[in-house]
Amino acid sequence: MNILAIDTSTMISTVTIASNDEIIGDFNVNQQKTHSESLVPMIENLLNLLGMEIKDIDLYVIAKGPGSFTGLRIGMTIAKTLAQVNGKKLIPISTLLALANNSSSDKLKVPMLDARGNRVYGGVFDKDFKEIIKEDLYTIEDFSALVNELDQEVELIGEIGKKYQDKFPKGKILPLNFNNCIGKSLIKLAIADKDKNFNLYEIIPNYLRKSQAEREMPKELKDRLNDKKNGQI
């Protein structure tokens, strides 16, 4: 089975390909271009380097978020299009769960992504990747308080961990290679979920909050859209 995984949750564009449970290609680019400019060429280039075509892919995997609103939309749209056009299954995976899976230690894992304004997307997972603290949008003060209440050594996973390390007295920063690229973890989790059924048309990004445009939308317009959604106009 050939699996293609995509992650556009952050500034890093990731495309990873596995064949028969072995990673054969892993392409990660942190650049100023938007994911819409870089992602499709990355997929095409990696397939070409491996001597493969898109028709050779049997299963697609997408990091569903949380993360960058724009990035998640782009990645999800491209992944769903590829799966639909080629008649293949798409498996959505939590970005935070994939980030936690970058570590295989017995310590509690605390994956975090920057949500700006002293806020983080975060969660806590045990050594078996069972969710201990629900992944959600938190202020760093609230999240660190919840983690510190556990009174255990934890691994801070994600590039934002270094910025907030002082908030976690028992927190350990992992080396750089643990903190961003999650393609291999997406493949690992997708293999575990490959027999589950996912409705392609019901797979959507997990933003964990409204977009800036939605938050700043005038109340009158919000009310009109809600009325329309409820069939009142």
Task: Annotate each language-model stretch with its function.
Residues 1-64:
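N-terminal beta-alpha supersecondary unit
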Residues 3-5, 61, 71, 109-112:
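Short glycine-aspartate micro-motif
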Residues 13-18, 119-124, 206:
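Short beta-strand scaffold segments in enzyme catalytic cores
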Residues 22, 89-181, 212, 233:
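Surface "functional belts" at beta-alpha junctions
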Residues 30-38, 69, 73, 77, ...:
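Residues at secondary-structure transition points
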Residues 59-90, 95:
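DPxDG-like acidic metal-binding loop motif
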Residues 175-233:
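Acyltransferase
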